[in-house]
């Protein structure tokens, strides 16, 4: 798939960087073969240097390359990893759409003082996967697609180091696509049982320990919160645990907890039709955790990790749980149910407690939890909450490295008072619509207790209704790369 070479050969296409107000030595060398015509195109603004612009130039036999794709990156001083990701992803999409199977990239043309060749190689391989991802459909009339099968990386840097960076980037991109495919699956095809089977296959592939708790075992452990959500369903619930041992001693364990609600009708607090369509994606947190575990399994960081996925659907029937019910969670805390559509936090409550039972010293939960976070932060920023600023800073640094933006929301004492306000139980699961995202996160904090914890609400970032820089409409695979990067950096400390 990737080859590292020092010189150009015969290629269907070559990708070259263009910065504003600067003609690089790479462009100057090409311009000699074009007898000054490239500089003329630049002077006439027919080769664009604007961010994310792509200009195609046919060689017309002047070189052994058929066509060149010049990628505009804007001003060099404003050049970022986010610009690089978006620009290269768009380029790979373009090559795929134009049915080019063999391409090369002048890697060093994208290198600056801020971004070295290792960074560029990692990002190029990552967005090679992300940008060319195709939505998996079930149409009987399937179109034949031509894929971009080969990318040759031209660089003067050390080949082994570049190959290693390409491998890591590719693993990150491929695992993100795995998560996308899971989230896009129809709910009749991805039940809690099927999700558990997927997780077990992943664990066995990468030699991880695993446990899948059945309903009877959950009852023995007192997982009343997850079981309450499952009451209305004919599909059995699953509590999934994947255990990766990256150190000889079982300590400093990171617990990744992903919400695995395979379909959410809202239960008796029923969603309207428009609010229900798309709820197959309510297991986006579970997919993010499984994607991260795929990366961890491939790259083998020296860090202990537990992945926990509480999984069920949330449907209506004569046996479904109801507003006014009082349930007992695995932690022993009782919960007054005021809203059955606030079910994700109930499942996660038992997931967090189970992660602690298995030895997690740090907790990061990921969930498509609230519409409130979309109102607050929109569809491009993940909401975050924490009880430990040190852990949050580590998550934030990982997210900045992957360009998956997060923003911290507060937890004040009055927020805790609101989730503890119940005449009948220790907690209530839905204090009201105002501050909805904060209330949900604060509720989860009651189960994290003193264990360092970060909550990531991906309700706005888990999917998109239109094509975007890094892929097609549908699931984004958000937080896969951030979680994996967090674990990788923990393992390096």
From Swiss-Prot:
Binds 2 manganese ions per subunit. This is Probable cytosol aminopeptidase. It comes from Bacillus cytotoxicus (strain DSM 22905 / CIP 110041 / 391-98 / NVH 391-98). CDD domains: Peptidase_M17 (cd00433). One of its GO terms (biological process) is proteolysis. Its EC number is 3.4.11.1, 3.4.11.10. It catalyses: Release of an N-terminal amino acid, Xaa-|-Yaa-, in which Xaa is preferably Leu, but may be other amino acids including Pro although not Arg or Lys, and Yaa may be Pro. Amino acid amides and methyl esters are also readily hydrolyzed, but rates on arylamides are exceedingly low; Release of an N-terminal amino acid, preferentially leucine, but not glutamic or aspartic acids. The active site is at residues 271, 345. It is an enzyme of class 3 (hydrolase). Belongs to the peptidase M17 family. Gene3D superfamilies: Leucine Aminopeptidase, subunit E, domain 1 (3.40.220.10), Zn peptidases (3.40.630.10). Its main location: cytoplasm. It is found in: Cytoplasm. PANTHER family: CYTOSOL AMINOPEPTIDASE, LEUCINE AMINOPEPTIDASE-RELATED. Mn(2+) 2 binds at residues 259, 264, 282, 343. Presumably involved in the processing and regular turnover of intracellular proteins. Catalyzes the removal of unsubstituted N-terminal amino acids from various peptides. Keywords: Aminopeptidase, Cytoplasm, Hydrolase, Manganese, Metal-binding, Protease. GO terms for cellular component: cytoplasm.
């Amino acid at each position: 798939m990737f080859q590292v070479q020092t010189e150009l050969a015969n290629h269907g296409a070559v990708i070259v960087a263009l910065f504003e107000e600067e003609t690089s030595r790479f462009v100057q060398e090409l311009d000699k073969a074009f007898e000054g015509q490239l500089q003329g195109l630049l002077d006439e603004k027919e080769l664009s240097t604007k961010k994310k612009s792509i200009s195609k130039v046919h060689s017309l036999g002047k070189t052994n390359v058929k066509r060149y794709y010049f990628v505009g990156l804007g001003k060099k001083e404003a050049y970022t990893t986010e610009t690089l990701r978006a620009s290269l992803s768009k380029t790979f999409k373009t090559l795929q759409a134009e049915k080019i199977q063999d391409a090369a990239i002048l890697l060093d043309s994208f290198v600056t003082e801020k971004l070295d060749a290792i960074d560029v190689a990692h990002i190029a391989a990552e967005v090679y996967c992300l940008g060319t991802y195709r939505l998996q459909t079930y149409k009987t009339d399937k179109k034949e697609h031509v894929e971009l099968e080969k990318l040759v990386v031209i660089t003067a840097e050390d080949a082994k180091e570049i190959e290693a960076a390409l491998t890591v980037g590719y693993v990150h991109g491929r695992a993100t696509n795995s998560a996308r495919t899971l989230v896009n699956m129809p709910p009749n095809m991805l039940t809690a049982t099927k999700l558990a089977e997927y997780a077990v296959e992943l664990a066995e592939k990468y030699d991880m320990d695993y446990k899948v708790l059945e309903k009877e075992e959950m009852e023995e452990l007192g997982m009343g919160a997850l079981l309450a959500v499952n009451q209305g369903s004919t599909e059995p619930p699953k509590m999934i645990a994947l255990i990766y041992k990256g150190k000889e001693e079982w300590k400093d364990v990171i617990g990744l907890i992903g919400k695995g609600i395979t379909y959410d009708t809202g239960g008796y607090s029923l969603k309207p039709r428009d609010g229900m369509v798309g709820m197959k994606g309510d297991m986006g947190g579970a997919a993010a955790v499984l994607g991260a575990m795929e990366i961890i399994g491939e790259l083998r960081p020296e860090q202990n990790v537990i992945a926990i996925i509480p999984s069920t659907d949330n449907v209506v029937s004569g046996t479904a749980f109801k507003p006014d019910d009082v349930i007992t969670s695995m932690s022993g805390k009782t919960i007054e149910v005021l809203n059955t559509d606030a079910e994700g936090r109930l499942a996660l409550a038992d997931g967090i407690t189970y992660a602690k039972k298995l030895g997690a010293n740090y907790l990061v939960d990921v969930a498509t939890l609230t519409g409130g976070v979309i109102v607050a932060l929109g569809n491009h920023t993940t909401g975050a909450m924490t009880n430990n600023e040190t852990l949050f800073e580590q998550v934030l640094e990982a997210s900045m490295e992957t360009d998956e933006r997060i923003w911290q929301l507060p937890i004040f004492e009055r927020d805790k008072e609101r989730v503890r306000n119940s005449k009948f139980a220790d907690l209530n699961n839905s204090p009201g619509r105002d501050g909805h995202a904060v209330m949900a996160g604060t509720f989860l904090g009651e189960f994290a207790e003193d264990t360092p914890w970060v909550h990531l609400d991906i309700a706005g970032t888990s999917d998109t209704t239109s094509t975007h820089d890094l892929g097609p409409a549908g699931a984004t695979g958000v937080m896969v790369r951030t979680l994996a990067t967090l674990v990788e950096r923990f393992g390096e400390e």
